[in-house]
């Protein structure tokens, strides 16, 4: 080894040591890669589920007699474990019980649900929710599924140059200008904007019908919520845009009572109020007439009527006083009676507010029935209806993410940057924090944020609302902050008011302060205060995770349950027009009276109205079931290999409900954005229609509580990188200068460079170290886990890196996988977090290990039992098998890998094999990316994989009788059922082929009347063909393998398996295939270099190296330069050097007497084998008297390795070269020199010798070790042929596709080819009897079985269709017969059909006779069959 190492030796586990060539050292432990799934579901079960269920309670009956209250929630453990659910096709779910309390408010009686006799649980059974497994999946009906995360636009406020409102019928209404878009999670989308060439601010919102977008002034909306004109002008400091908005709307005292079309209802009520008031005065009837008038008509108008009556009365009071004081001057009178005038003005403002609310409610078509508060009598008004529409969370929800976005946009601290303030900013003690005329810088912003959080700045004010507006939740948050700034920083002659939100609002609904701050933002844009939003910025998007999707679905179900309960309570309460009388106990209802007068006992009467009788939980159960079975974002988990499963769970989709369509051609949506950095991988995305719509989370990214993707960065202070780190959202990124992780640091982590490359607000530039706020953790945080597993990805073209990332997920787990010699250091993390490895739950010592389980005694002296998965079929039909990698007595730590899963080696990801590859052509067999492989890869099972197919059959109860599992099926040959036992089920270990019976089953036929003599014969000869038919499970077309297991699930089992109705038994047969690599299989490297195996060459014919080592694979060198994936060449040379050093180390360790433990850590081999290997190598060294490695002949080492079941595949030092931070040119040169590879003369290339002739090839050839994968696209799944098969009922042509045993389409161009060769008879057969000539087909079949010449004289169905289409055009079609007669086509077809039908009947009779003869032989054979005994179990 060299003294000056350019690497560090990094021990991944006890058995894995890698040379780490990374330049940036970091101890940062990334988040668990499954956190996005597991933590989200944990949040749902611990918090969201209870919140949603309890949100509808308490519920009161309309008359107030009953109250139903929520008292608690119980989440029970699943009744079946995960593996049982998989085997039985059940859902792994946890039952939910809710504790409800029904109180009779008149008697004080309290009722609760009684104990469930079946389950023994208290409370109401609400339903069952599928439980997430430890690896982040759900078992639904025996199949593993997962929830894909959806990326959607975040609720919040957006400032845009153009926007649109979607209307019905795919219509849109477009707007341009300075637009503030209020985008809720649930509710009406509103736009606030200044129209072109105007200065007034307008609001646009879609009406409830969706047919139109309605426009009104922003001041109209503010007045509708209870602000007066004076309050509006005061808040906005008399801004021009606000004044103009007030001028154009008609909600002012001088307009409100005028007789116009807009004020028709006001004027009518005003006139009626005058008349009633005068009549009331004359008759002295006080308020009777007034109350009668107010209660007439719509209850929503009552508030407006009341206000107008108050105005009339107040006016009369003032007029009366004026009449009494007619000699007093007006000014003096008004001064003396200011209170009266103020009260009248307030009433007028309340009328204006109610009228504005009424107009907006009618304009938007707000559904009054949805307004919950209107149930309470006396509170009905248009103002409350409008407030409920916008301020009730159940109707208008901006969510926590929306509130976060509102604060980020509307707080003053976010809007003052680079502006000169016109007022002092003072604290609560009147100390000046920032004097006026100061240009606000980044440091000032940080100070303002800090002081605002502490509520220490004296700029907070409160919105004053009219008293009528304060009757609902509108008053929850009315605080705002304001400050004046100069419109122009240089001139400083005019100011404008910036009105912002007060910090500290946690409400998830819209507030009046939000609308006020939004209005300010709109007119501030005229003076370049604020900024426009980039809608594609990741800060404006968020992820919907499993907890949010489930929460929304359960909220829907609870709303339906609430409606059902309310209806039941109304009936029980007597609100359904059943109220009889009211006594001192309260309201006596029809239901109560019926119960009281009935013959029921006292106990029965008490139970008549119970908790269970008023709740129906079926909606909850059906919606949850529907979500997990049919929701667009629920998908089968890809279990091809650990990387595929892990990547699947970290997948992000822009499609789904409310998302983007895959047909949308918008490139801006699909493109990479600068804000994706360290959050979404710029490389990994599918090819094709879904490109850019399906994405992957970056390696170190997480999702915060609001659904925003956050990325970690180290904190930098005064040019020094600190140990602590912080997660930032994409919007927070824009506020800081973030340096790349490649900067030079000293031992104290101070940045040495005078200027560093850093990002700020989407652009990259040079900054001094003292300006830097944060620094990247590691370079690999930019890409996803799949891309981070590709070494030298920085040397690959982006398109090829994309293919490499995707193809790693298609790699098939091999029988003996090997971790890559040239890795990136992420292999352990991927395998560990994938969920397929066995991971220790606690610290402890291993007490027992075998192939089935591992037992560890933990530090609490308790036994942890780990059952290993053995040969389980995955969703992709690959083999999931776990192998222990610990030994008895070994000390293990929490989270340590103790067992390998599929495609793992010693805890590391191992998708393929390290293969000796040469880039050379060979007789043209690797033309166009084809791959030539050595026979060694086949013979030694290098790329052999195991595949498991599941075959299921159900034994059913039918109307004709029960089906039966039996060995005695009618009309089935003995050959087909040769592997069945005496019960009719295939034997484990049998090698079955296409058509073999796996499970014998008979189904009863319908009742068929038979003669007595026929029944006698059937009994004598055992003929069941007349009473039952064969419905056995057989091996499908094109399949074969060895039966690995048979599972029988009966409803009568002791473990109580619950089977569907009418199912007696389910039998599952698992067939295993061992697939060797063969011609037609697809292989690939990690750099997007893919190809099909074109030839398997004998080992002796393969080109070989100077020492006689034959190549394993030959790749075409022309596949490298045009594809620009040079990373594969660097991997090739580095891998070869590492393998050569491994050979040297194998001998040198024994020479230096370092002990066998070094073999274990360096090569990852078993302890027993390592001891024996060390002993044998040491003996060889003594025998040869070797002093250094080169003194030992490698052939001797090869023999020793072979005796121990090893090969040079097991020997080789492992390299870690992280992406963007790995081995550079100097490192590769250094390691090649260490391996004694001549790079001075031949640049690392080798002389290759032709295996057929022994002659060297002309030029030097690049040879080395490359990590190659065998992909899921195997020829066994694709190759297919058809001799006899099904036909389409409509066209009568053969079906297509392997699954339907279909034929290959013989298209137009293929017809041309046969025409060119003059193959007339072949062409005739293909287009007629092999296609859709039904009669000709039958005749040909009969001729073949009789040995006659084939004569096809039928008419193809497609020709018949052509003639009908021509007749449809009015053309007369005739046929010229052999005797020169002209016959109409219809008559000719009819005659042909008649003749062919006669022929068919003759053929049918002959065939039936043959079948009957053969059946008789079969029955006699069965009767005399003594080959097996009934008692014998095959």
Curated annotation (Swiss-Prot):
Catalytic activity: RNA(n) + a ribonucleoside 5'-triphosphate = RNA(n+1) + diphosphate
GO terms for MF: DNA binding; DNA-directed RNA polymerase activity; ribonucleoside binding
UniProt KW Nucleotidyltransferase keyword: yes
GO-annotated cellular components: DNA-directed RNA polymerase complex
Top-level taxon in the UniProt lineage: Bacteria
Key words of the record: DNA-directed RNA polymerase, Nucleotidyltransferase, Transcription, Transferase
Pfam families, sorted: RNA_pol_Rpb2_1, RNA_pol_Rpb2_2, RNA_pol_Rpb2_3, RNA_pol_Rpb2_45, RNA_pol_Rpb2_6, RNA_pol_Rpb2_7
Family matches, as InterPro entries: DNA-dir_RNA_pol_bsu_ext_1_sf, DNA-dir_RNA_pol_bsu_external_1, DNA-dir_RNA_pol_su2, DNA-dir_RNAP_su2_dom, DNA-dir_RNAP_su2_hyb_sf, RNA_pol_bsu_bac, RNA_pol_bsu_CS, RNA_pol_bsu_protrusion
Gene Ontology annotations of biological process type: DNA-templated transcription
Assigned EC number: 2.7.7.6
Nucleotidyltransferase recorded as keyword: yes
Entry-linked SUPFAM superfamilies: beta and beta-prime subunits of DNA dependent RNA-polymerase
Membership in a protein family: Belongs to the RNA polymerase beta chain family.
Role description: DNA-dependent RNA polymerase catalyzes the transcription of DNA into RNA using the four ribonucleoside triphosphates as substrates.
Subunit structure: The RNAP catalytic core consists of 2 alpha, 1 beta, 1 beta' and 1 omega subunit. When a sigma factor is associated with the core the holoenzyme is formed, which can initiate transcription.
Name used for this protein in its record: DNA-directed RNA polymerase subunit beta
Species assigned in the record: Ureaplasma parvum serovar 3 (strain ATCC 700970)
Gene that this polypeptide is encoded by: rpoB
């Amino acid at each position: 080894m060299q003294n000056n190492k350019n690497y560090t030796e990094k021990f991944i586990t006890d058995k894995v040591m890698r040379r780490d060539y990374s330049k940036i050292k970091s101890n940062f432990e990334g988040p668990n890669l499954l956190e996005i799934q597991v933590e989200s579901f944990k949040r749902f079960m611990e918090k969201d589920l209870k919140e949603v269920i309890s949100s509808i309670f308490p519920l009161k009956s309309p008359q107030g007699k009953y109250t139903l209250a929520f008292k608690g929630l119980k989440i029970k453990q699943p009744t079946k474990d995960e593996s049982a659910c998989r085997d039985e096709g059940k859902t792994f779910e946890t039952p939910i019980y809710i504790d409800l309390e029904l109180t009779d408010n008149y008697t004080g009686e309290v009722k609760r649900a009684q104990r469930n006799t079946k389950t023994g649980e208290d409370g109401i059974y609400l339903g069952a929710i599928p439980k997430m497994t430890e690896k982040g999946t759900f078992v639904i009906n025996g199949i593993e599924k997962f929830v894909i995360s959806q990326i959607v636009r975040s609720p919040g406020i957006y400032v845009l140059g153009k926007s649109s409102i979607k209307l019905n019928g795919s219509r849109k209404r477009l707007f341009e200008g300075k637009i503030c878009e209020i985008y809720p999670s649930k509710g009406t989308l509103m736009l606030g904007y200044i129209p072109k060439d105007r200065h007034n601010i307008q609001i646009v919102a879609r009406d409830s019908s969706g047919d139109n977008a309605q426009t009104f002034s922003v001041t109209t909306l503010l007045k509708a919520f209870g602000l007066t004109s004076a309050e509006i002008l005061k808040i906005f400091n008399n801004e021009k845009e606000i004044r103009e908005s007030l001028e154009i709307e008609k909600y002012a005292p001088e307009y409100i009572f005028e007789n116009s079309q807009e004020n028709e209802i006001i004027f009518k009520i005003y006139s009626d109020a005058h008349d009633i008031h005068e009549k009331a005065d004359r008759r002295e009837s006080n308020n009777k007439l007034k109350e009668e008038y107010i209660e007439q008509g719509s209850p929503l108008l009552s508030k407006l009527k009341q206000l107008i009556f108050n105005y009339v009365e107040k006016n009369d009071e003032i007029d009366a006083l004026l009449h009494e004081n007619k000699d007093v001057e007006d000014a003096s009178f008004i001064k003396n009676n200011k209170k009266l005038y103020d009260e009248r003005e307030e009433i007028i403002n309340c009328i204006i507010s109610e009228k504005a609310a009424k107009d907006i409610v009618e304009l938007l078509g707000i559904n009054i029935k949805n307004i919950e508060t209107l149930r309470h009598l006396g509170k009905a008004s248009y103002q409350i209806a409008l407030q409920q529409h916008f301020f009730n969370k159940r109707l208008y929800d901006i969510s926590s993410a929306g509130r976060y976005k509102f604060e980020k946009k509307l707080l003053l601290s976010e809007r003052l940057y680079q502006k000169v303030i016109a007022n002092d900013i003072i604290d609560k003690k009147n100390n000046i924090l920032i004097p006026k005329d100061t240009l606000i810088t980044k440091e000032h912003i940080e100070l303002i944020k800090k002081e605002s959080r502490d509520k220490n700045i004296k700029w907070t004010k409160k919105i004053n609302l009219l008293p009528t507006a304060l009757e609902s939740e509108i008053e929850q948050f009315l605080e705002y902050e304001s400050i004046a700034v100069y419109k122009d920083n240089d001139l400083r002659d005019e100011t404008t008011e910036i009105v912002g939100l007060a910090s500290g609002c946690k409400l998830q609904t819209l507030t009046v302060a939000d609308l006020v701050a939004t209005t300010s933002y709109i007119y501030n844009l005229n003076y370049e205060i604020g900024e426009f939003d980039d809608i594609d910025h990741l800060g404006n998007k968020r992820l919907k995770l499993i907890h949010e999707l489930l929460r929304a679905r359960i909220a829907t179900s609870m709303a339906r349950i609430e409606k059902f309960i309310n209806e039941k309570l109304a009936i029980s309460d007597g609100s359904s027009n059943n109220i009889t009388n009211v006594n001192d106990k309260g309201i006596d209802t029809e239901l109560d009276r019926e119960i009281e007068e009935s013959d029921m006992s006292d106990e029965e009467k008490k139970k008549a109205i119970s908790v269970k009788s008023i709740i129906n939980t079926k909606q909850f159960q059906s919606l949850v079931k529907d979500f997990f079975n049919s929701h667009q974002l629920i998908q089968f988990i890809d279990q091809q290999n650990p990387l595929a499963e892990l990547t699947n769970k970290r997948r992000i989709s822009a499609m789904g409900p409310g998302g983007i369509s895959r047909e949308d051609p918008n490139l801006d949506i699909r493109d990479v954005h600068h804000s994706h950095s360290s959050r979404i991988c710029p490389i990994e995305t599918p090819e094709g229609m879904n490109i850019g719509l399906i994405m992957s989370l970056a390696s170190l990214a997480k999702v915060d509580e609001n659904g925003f993707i956050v990325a970690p960065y180290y904190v930098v202070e005064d040019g020094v990188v600190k140990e602590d780190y912080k997660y930032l959202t994409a919007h927070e990124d824009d506020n800081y200068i973030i340096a790349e992780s490649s900067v030079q640091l000293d031992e104290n982590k101070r940045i040495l460079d005078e200027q560093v490359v850093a990002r700020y607000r989407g652009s990259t530039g040079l900054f001094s170290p003292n300006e830097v706020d944060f620094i990247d953790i590691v370079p690999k945080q930019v890409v996803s886990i799949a891309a981070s597993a590709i070494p030298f990805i920085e040397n690959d073209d982006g398109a090829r890196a994309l293919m490499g990332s995707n193809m790693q997920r298609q790699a098939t787990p091999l029988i003996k996988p090997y971790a890559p010699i040239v890795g990136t250091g992420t292999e352990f993390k991927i395998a560990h977090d994938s969920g397929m490895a066995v991971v220790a739950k606690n610290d402890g010592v291993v007490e027992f290990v075998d192939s089935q389980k591992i037992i560890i005694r933990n530090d609490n002296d308790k036994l942890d039992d780990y059952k290993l998965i053995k040969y389980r079929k995955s969703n992709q039909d690959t083999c999931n098998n776990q192998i222990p990698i610990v030994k008895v007595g070994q000390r293990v730590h929490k989270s340590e890998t103790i067992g390998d899963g599929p495609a793992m080696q010693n805890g590391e990801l191992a998708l393929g094999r390290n293969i000796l590859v040469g880039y050379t052509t060979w007789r043209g067999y690797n033309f166009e990316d084809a791959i030539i492989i050595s026979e060694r890869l086949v013979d030694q099972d290098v790329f052999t994989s195991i595949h498991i197919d599941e075959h299921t059959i159900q034994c059913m109860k039918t109307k004709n009788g029960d089906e039966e599992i039996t060995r005695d099926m009618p009309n089935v040959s003995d050959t087909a059922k040769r592997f069945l036992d005496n019960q009719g089920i295939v034997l484990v270990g049998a090698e079955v082929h296409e058509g073999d019976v796996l499970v014998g089953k008979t189904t009863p036929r319908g009742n068929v009347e038979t003669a007595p003599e026929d029944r006698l014969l059937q009994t004598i000869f055992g003929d069941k063909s007349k009473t039952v038919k064969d419905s056995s499970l057989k091996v499908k077309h094109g399949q074969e393998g060895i039966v690995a297991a048979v599972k029988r699930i009966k409803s009568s089992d002791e473990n109580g398996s619950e089977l569907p109705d009418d199912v007696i038994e389910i039998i599952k047969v698992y067939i295993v295939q061992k697939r060797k690599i063969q011609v037609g299989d697809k292989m690939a490297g990690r750099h997007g270099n893919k190809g099909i195996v074109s030839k398997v060459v004998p080992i002796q014919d393969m080109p070989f190296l100077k020492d006689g080592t034959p190549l394993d694979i030959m790749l075409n060198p022309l596949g490298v330069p045009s594809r620009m994936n040079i990373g594969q060449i660097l991997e090739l040379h580095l891998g070869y050097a590492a393998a050569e050093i491994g050979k040297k180390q194998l001998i040198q360790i024994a020479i230096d007497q370092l002990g066998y433990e070094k073999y274990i850590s360096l090569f990852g081999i078993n302890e027993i084998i390592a001891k024996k290997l060390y002993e044998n190598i040491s003996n060889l060294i003594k025998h040869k008297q070797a002093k250094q490695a080169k003194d030992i002949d490698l052939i001797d080492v090869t023999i020793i390795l072979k005796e121990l079941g090893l090969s040079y595949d097991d020997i080789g030092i492992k390299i870690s070269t992280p992406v963007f931070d790995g081995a550079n040119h100097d490192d590769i040169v250094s390691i090649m020199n260490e391996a004694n590879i001549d790079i001075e003369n031949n640049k690392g290339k080798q002389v290759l010798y032709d295996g057929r002739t022994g002659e060297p090839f002309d030029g030097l050839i690049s040879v080395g070790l490359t990590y190659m994968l065998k992909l899921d696209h195997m020829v066994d799944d694709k190759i297919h042929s058809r001799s006899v098969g099904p036909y389409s009922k409509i066209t009568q042509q053969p079906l297509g596709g392997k699954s339907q045993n279909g034929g290959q389409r013989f298209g137009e161009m293929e017809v041309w080819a046969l025409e060119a060769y003059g193959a007339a008879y072949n062409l005739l057969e293909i287009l007629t009897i092999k296609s859709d000539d039904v009669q000709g087909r039958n005749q040909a079949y009969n001729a073949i079985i009789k040995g006659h010449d084939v004569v096809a004289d039928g008419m193809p169905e497609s020709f018949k269709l052509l003639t009908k289409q021509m007749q449809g055009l009015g053309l007369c079609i005739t046929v010229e017969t052999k005797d020169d007669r002209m016959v109409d086509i219809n008559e000719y077809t009819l005659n042909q059909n008649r003749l062919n039908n006669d022929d068919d009947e003759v053929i049918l009779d002959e065939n039936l006779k043959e079948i009957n003869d053969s059946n008789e032989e079969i029955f006699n054979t069965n009767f005399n069959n003594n080959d097996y005994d009934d008692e014998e179990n095959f």
